[in-house]
Protein backbone atom coordinates (compact mmCIF):
# COMPACT_ATOMS: atom_id res chain seq x y z
CA UNK A 1 0.00 0.00 0.00
CA UNK A 2 2.89 2.36 0.67
CA UNK A 3 4.16 2.03 -2.91
CA UNK A 4 0.81 3.28 -4.18
CA UNK A 5 1.18 6.26 -1.89
CA UNK A 6 4.60 7.12 -3.26
CA UNK A 7 3.33 6.75 -6.83
CA UNK A 8 0.62 9.32 -6.06
CA UNK A 9 3.16 11.62 -4.37
CA UNK A 10 5.31 11.61 -7.50
CA UNK A 11 2.26 12.18 -9.72
CA UNK A 12 1.14 15.11 -7.55
CA UNK A 13 4.66 16.55 -7.49
CA UNK A 14 5.09 16.32 -11.28
CA UNK A 15 1.67 17.83 -11.97
CA UNK A 16 2.12 20.70 -9.49
CA UNK A 17 5.56 21.48 -10.89
CA UNK A 18 4.27 21.34 -14.48
CA UNK A 19 1.46 23.69 -13.45
CA UNK A 20 3.95 26.27 -12.21
CA UNK A 21 6.06 26.09 -15.37
CA UNK A 22 3.04 26.24 -17.69
CA UNK A 23 1.43 29.17 -15.89
CA UNK A 24 4.70 31.11 -15.76
CA UNK A 25 5.33 30.47 -19.46
CA UNK A 26 1.83 31.59 -20.38
CA UNK A 27 1.89 34.68 -18.18
CA UNK A 28 5.23 35.80 -19.64
CA UNK A 29 3.68 35.84 -23.11
CA UNK A 30 0.39 37.56 -22.22
CA UNK A 31 0.19 41.32 -22.75
CA UNK A 32 0.65 43.56 -19.72
CA UNK A 33 -2.46 44.73 -17.93
CA UNK A 34 -2.51 48.08 -16.17
CA UNK A 35 -5.28 49.80 -14.24
CA UNK A 36 -5.65 52.42 -16.97
CA UNK A 37 -5.43 50.17 -20.03
CA UNK A 38 -7.09 46.80 -20.23
CA UNK A 39 -6.49 44.77 -23.39
CA UNK A 40 -9.54 43.44 -25.16
CA UNK A 41 -10.83 40.02 -24.22
CA UNK A 42 -10.02 38.75 -27.72
CA UNK A 43 -6.39 39.84 -27.24
CA UNK A 44 -6.16 38.03 -23.91
CA UNK A 45 -7.80 34.86 -25.21
CA UNK A 46 -5.74 34.55 -28.39
CA UNK A 47 -3.02 31.99 -28.82
CA UNK A 48 -0.97 29.60 -26.76
CA UNK A 49 -0.38 31.74 -23.63
CA UNK A 50 -3.96 31.31 -22.47
CA UNK A 51 -3.83 27.61 -23.31
CA UNK A 52 -0.65 27.24 -21.24
CA UNK A 53 -2.26 28.99 -18.26
CA UNK A 54 -5.44 26.90 -18.54
CA UNK A 55 -3.49 23.65 -18.86
CA UNK A 56 -1.49 24.72 -15.81
CA UNK A 57 -4.71 25.22 -13.86
CA UNK A 58 -5.90 21.78 -14.98
CA UNK A 59 -2.57 20.31 -13.85
CA UNK A 60 -3.13 21.86 -10.42
CA UNK A 61 -6.57 20.29 -10.25
CA UNK A 62 -5.19 16.88 -11.20
CA UNK A 63 -2.40 17.35 -8.68
CA UNK A 64 -5.01 17.85 -5.97
CA UNK A 65 -6.80 14.64 -7.02
CA UNK A 66 -3.47 12.80 -6.76
CA UNK A 67 -2.91 14.36 -3.34
CA UNK A 68 -6.24 12.95 -2.16
CA UNK A 69 -4.92 9.51 -3.12
CA UNK A 70 -1.69 10.21 -1.22
CA UNK A 71 -3.75 10.95 1.88
CA UNK A 72 -5.46 7.60 1.50
CA UNK A 73 -2.22 5.58 1.43
CA UNK A 74 0.45 7.44 3.41
CA UNK A 75 0.65 9.01 6.85
CA UNK A 76 0.48 12.78 6.55
CA UNK A 77 3.73 13.20 8.49
CA UNK A 78 5.52 11.17 5.82
CA UNK A 79 3.73 12.51 2.74
CA UNK A 80 3.59 16.25 3.33
CA UNK A 81 7.36 16.89 3.48
CA UNK A 82 7.73 15.19 0.10
CA UNK A 83 5.61 17.90 -1.51
CA UNK A 84 8.36 20.41 -0.72
CA UNK A 85 10.43 18.62 -3.37
CA UNK A 86 8.38 20.62 -5.88
CA UNK A 87 10.39 23.70 -4.83
CA UNK A 88 13.54 21.99 -6.07
CA UNK A 89 11.90 20.70 -9.26
CA UNK A 90 10.44 24.10 -10.15
CA UNK A 91 13.73 25.87 -9.39
CA UNK A 92 15.65 23.50 -11.66
CA UNK A 93 13.04 23.87 -14.41
CA UNK A 94 13.19 27.66 -14.14
CA UNK A 95 16.96 27.60 -14.44
CA UNK A 96 17.36 25.02 -17.21
CA UNK A 97 14.35 25.61 -19.47
CA UNK A 98 15.56 28.08 -22.09
CA UNK A 99 12.34 30.08 -22.31
CA UNK A 100 12.33 30.77 -18.56
CA UNK A 101 16.09 31.32 -18.35
CA UNK A 102 16.14 32.30 -14.68
CA UNK A 103 19.53 32.83 -13.06
CA UNK A 104 21.15 30.20 -10.89
CA UNK A 105 22.87 31.40 -7.74
CA UNK A 106 24.82 29.90 -4.90
CA UNK A 107 22.24 31.11 -2.39
CA UNK A 108 19.35 29.51 -4.27
CA UNK A 109 21.32 26.29 -4.74
CA UNK A 110 22.05 26.16 -1.01
CA UNK A 111 18.37 26.75 -0.27
CA UNK A 112 17.37 23.84 -2.50
CA UNK A 113 20.02 21.63 -0.87
CA UNK A 114 18.66 22.53 2.57
CA UNK A 115 15.15 21.61 1.42
CA UNK A 116 16.41 18.27 0.08
CA UNK A 117 18.32 17.63 3.30
CA UNK A 118 15.21 18.44 5.33
CA UNK A 119 13.07 16.04 3.30
CA UNK A 120 15.70 13.34 3.71
CA UNK A 121 15.89 13.89 7.47
CA UNK A 122 12.13 13.81 7.94
CA UNK A 123 11.76 10.74 5.72
CA UNK A 124 14.59 8.97 7.50
CA UNK A 125 13.07 9.77 10.86
CA UNK A 126 9.71 8.44 9.71
CA UNK A 127 11.33 5.18 8.57
CA UNK A 128 13.38 4.82 11.75
CA UNK A 129 10.31 5.09 14.00
CA UNK A 130 8.37 2.48 12.04
Swiss-Prot record:
UniProt topological domain (Cytoplasmic) ranges: 1-6, 71-79, 124-130
NCBIfam families named among the record's database cross-references: PRK02971.1-2
Domain named EamA: residues: 55-124
Its biological purpose: Translocates 4-amino-4-deoxy-L-arabinose-phosphoundecaprenol (alpha-L-Ara4N-phosphoundecaprenol) from the cytoplasmic to the periplasmic side of the inner membrane.
Gene Ontology terms, MF aspect: carbohydrate derivative transmembrane transporter activity
One of the GO BP terms on file: lipopolysaccharide biosynthetic process
Pathway named in the protein's UniProt entry: Bacterial outer membrane biogenesis; lipopolysaccharide biosynthesis
Subcellular location field: Cell inner membrane
Residue ranges crossing the lipid bilayer per the database entry: 7-27, 50-70, 80-100, 103-123
Topological domains annotated Periplasmic: 28-49, 101-102
Source species taxonomy: Bacteria, Pseudomonadati, Pseudomonadota, Gammaproteobacteria, Enterobacterales
Bilayer topology annotation: Multi-pass membrane protein
A GO term from the CC aspect: plasma membrane
PANTHER family: 4-AMINO-4-DEOXY-L-ARABINOSE-PHOSPHOUNDECAPRENOL FLIPPASE SUBUNIT ARNF-RELATED (PTHR30561:SF9), SMR FAMILY PROTON-DEPENDENT DRUG EFFLUX TRANSPORTER SUGE (PTHR30561)
Keywords: Cell inner membrane, Cell membrane, Lipid A biosynthesis, Lipid biosynthesis, Lipid metabolism, Lipopolysaccharide biosynthesis, Membrane, Transmembrane, Transmembrane helix, Transport
A Pfam family the protein falls into: EamA
Similarity comment: Belongs to the ArnF family.
HAMAP family reported in the protein's UniProt record: Flippase_ArnF
Protein name as annotated: Probable 4-amino-4-deoxy-L-arabinose-phosphoundecaprenol flippase subunit ArnF
Oligomeric form and interacting partners: Heterodimer of ArnE and ArnF.
Gene name of this polypeptide: arnF
SUPFAM superfamilies reported in the protein's UniProt record: Multidrug resistance efflux transporter EmrE
